[in-house]
């Protein structure tokens, strides 16, 4: 069977699941505090049920068999607190408190919330998906049309390091982009709208012909 979910290892307070789908394999490590029971309701559907009113756990996804988790929830909360404190103290901010328009407070709230949502959903090692992690649009893949819209603002908010994370993808995909350009009769590199982590062409009726994503890389590079 090509789709499997297995209990890779388990003890009194932790377990590791091995997930396999075709040639893709990843591991889910969970460490919890307190008593709990892990049960399988059906294929690929496991439930961890606490046996007390107070329960906490940490979870990690890895592409290789992991070492045992050593951290706990207190450490996770502390690391999160330190990260977001640094995030807000480093970047730009807005203050509409002097605005007389009655919509100013709501607009400020949305600007601040958007900074947070874009940081958690669009600042990874690959160009972001159109709907981030909230929804599963565009076949679950990123497409280069939206890289500018979803990542350029990081540099303008003085958080260029978050944009830089996904810029390396262009260098990794360059050999494939050069081959695509040659195939289509162009010089240089051809960044396709519909692509994937490897840089190859993803299925699309019009993706092969669209060019509006071509200058994004140049524009973003100037921001550094």
Q: Over which residues does each language-model region extend?
A:
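Acidic/polar, glycine-enriched structural segments that form the non-catalytic walls/loops
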Residues: 1-141, 160, 170-178
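Aromatic-rich carbohydrate-recognition surfaces in CAZymes
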Residues: 139-224
């Amino acid at each position: 069977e090509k789709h499997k979910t297995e209990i890779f290892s388990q003890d009194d307070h932790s377990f590791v699941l091995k997930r396999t789908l075709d040639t893709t394999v990843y591991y889910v490590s969970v460490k919890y505090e307190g008593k709990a029971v892990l049960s399988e309701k059906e294929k690929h559907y496991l439930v961890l049920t606490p046996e007390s009113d107070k329960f906490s756990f940490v979870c990690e996804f890895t592409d290789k068999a992991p070492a045992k988790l050593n951290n706990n929830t207190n450490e996770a909360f502390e690391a999160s607190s330190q990260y977001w404190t640094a995030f807000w103290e480093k970047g730009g901010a807005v203050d509409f408190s002097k605005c007389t328009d009655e919509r100013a407070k709501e607009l400020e709230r949305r600007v601040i919330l958007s900074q947070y949502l874009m940081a958690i959903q669009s600042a990874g090692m690959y160009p972001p998906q159109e709907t981030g992690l909230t929804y599963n649009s565009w076949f679950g893949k990123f497409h280069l049309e939206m890289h500018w819209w979803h990542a350029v603002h990081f540099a303008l908010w003085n958080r260029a390091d978050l944009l830089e994370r996904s810029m390396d993808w262009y260098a990794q995909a360059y050999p494939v982009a050069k081959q695509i350009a040659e195939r289509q009769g162009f010089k240089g590199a051809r960044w396709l709208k519909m692509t994937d982590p490897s840089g190859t062409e993803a299925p699309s009726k019009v993706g092969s012909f669209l060019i509006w994503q071509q200058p994004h890389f140049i524009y973003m590079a100037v921001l550094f």
